[in-house]
Amino acid sequence: MSAVIVNTVEQCGYFNRGQCQSCRHIQVPMAQQLMAKSLELQQLLKPFVAPSAAIFYPPVTGEATAFRNKAKMVVLGAAHAPVLGIVSPSGEAVSLCDCLLYPSDMQKLLHRLTQFVQQAGIPPYRVDKAKGELKFILLTRSQVRGEYLLRFVLRSHNSIERIERALPTLLAEYPQINVVSVNIQPIHMAILEGDEEIFLTENTRLEERFNDVPLFIRPKSFFQTNPQVAAQLYQTAREWVAEFAPKSLWDLFCGVGGFGLHCATKDIALTGIEIEAEAISCAQISANLMGLEKVQFMALDSTDFAQGKNAADKPDLIIVNPPRRGIGEALCQSLSEFAPRAILYSSCNPKTLAKDLEHIQGYHLTKVQLFDLFPHTDHFEVLAMLVKD
C-alpha cells in the first residue's frame, strides 16, 4: 500500500506505477519545466508584444515538493477499509496520503483521517451503485500557524452523528484542526460540493497570512494552493500597482481579497467584487483588521457590476483575476470603454488571457511574469500589466 512508499521528486511511486498521472512532468527537471512554460507563454502573447519590447520578467518558482496546502480526497473502499485518494487509470482505489506535494504533517493527518473514517464507520459513497455516504474529504492547511480546515462531503445527513461522536477524540489528538464542517452533496454526479454547509466547530474560518496581509479561508471560498509562490505573486502585484499611485482601485473576481488588500493603502478607495458571498465576508474581515476604511467588498457578478457602471465611475486602475475561462468579451469591452490608466490581469490560463487581450482595446503590455504555482503540470499563473496607449 502507499503507506510504505518512500517518494522523492525523482521517484514518485504513484507516478512510476501508473496509479496517478496528475503530475505528468514530475520526472522533468524543474528548470526544464520552467523553460517549457516560459516558451509557451511567450508564444501565446507574441501577437501583443512589439518585437523589440523586453516585457517578460524572470519566472518565479518555489519548492518542488511539500508546497500544496489543499488536499481533495475521494473516499473509496469500504467503511471497514476506507481509502483516501483517487481511482487510478486502471480502476483501482489508490491512497494518496503520501503524495509528495503535501507537507509531512499534512500527510500524517491524512493517514489519521483514514483511520477516523474507519473508526466512525462511515460508508464511502459508491458511484457505481449510488450507495454510501462519504464522498470526499477536503483538507486545507494554513502555513502561518499550521492549522487546518477539514470538510466531509456527504450524500445526506445520515452520517453526521457518526462524525460528531468520533470528532472529540480526533480534535484532542490534533488541536490544530481549527475548523470542521460537513457539506451535503446529494446529487449522483461528479460534483465536489453542495449548497448546504454545516459547521461542527465554533470556528468557521481559517486564518492565513501572506506577506503582511491577513487572509481568511472559509469552506467555499477560493484560495491559492501554493502559498509560497502566491505570496510572491501578491507582492509583485503590490509593487506594480504602486508605480501608478492610484487613488481608486477595482479588484474584480477578488476572492478573499488577496490582490486588492495587498495593493490598498489608507488613501486608496478599493472596491472588491466577487460572486461568492463567503469570500466577500472574509475579505471584509481582513480589511477591518488592516484598518482600511475606504474599502467596499460586494458579492456580485464582476461583469454585471462593470456593465452597471459608467465612465464617470471608473477607477484609476482595475485588477482582474478571473477563473480559467477568462473575463470574456463583454467585460473586455467594458474595460476598454472605462479606459482606466492601467489594468492588472492575473491569469491561471494563458490561452484565455491571450483571447481576452484580443478584445481589450487601447492598451499595450508593459510587464509579464510567470508564477509557477503548479509544478510538474502544464498549468501556471501569469501576471500581466496593461497600460493605456
UniProtKB/Swiss-Prot annotation:
Catalytic reactions on record: uridine(747) in 23S rRNA + S-adenosyl-L-methionine = 5-methyluridine(747) in 23S rRNA + S-adenosyl-L-homocysteine + H(+)
Record bears the keyword Electron transport: no
Keyword set, alphabetical order: 4Fe-4S, Iron, Iron-sulfur, Metal-binding, Methyltransferase, rRNA processing, S-adenosyl-L-methionine, Transferase
Entry keyword annotation includes Transferase: yes
Enzyme Commission (EC) number: 2.1.1.189
UniProt GO molecular function: 4 iron, 4 sulfur cluster binding; iron ion binding; rRNA (uridine-C5-)-methyltransferase activity
Binding-site residues for S-adenosyl-L-methionine, renumbered to this chain: 224, 253, 274, 321
EC class of the enzyme, as a word: transferase
Alphabetized Gene3D superfamilies for the sequence: 2.40.50.1070, Vaccinia Virus protein VP39 (3.40.50.150)
Biological function: Catalyzes the formation of 5-methyl-uridine at position 747 (m5U747) in 23S rRNA.
Protein family per UniProt: Belongs to the class I-like SAM-binding methyltransferase superfamily. RNA M5U methyltransferase family. RlmC subfamily.
Protein name: 23S rRNA (uracil(747)-C(5))-methyltransferase RlmC
Gene: rlmC
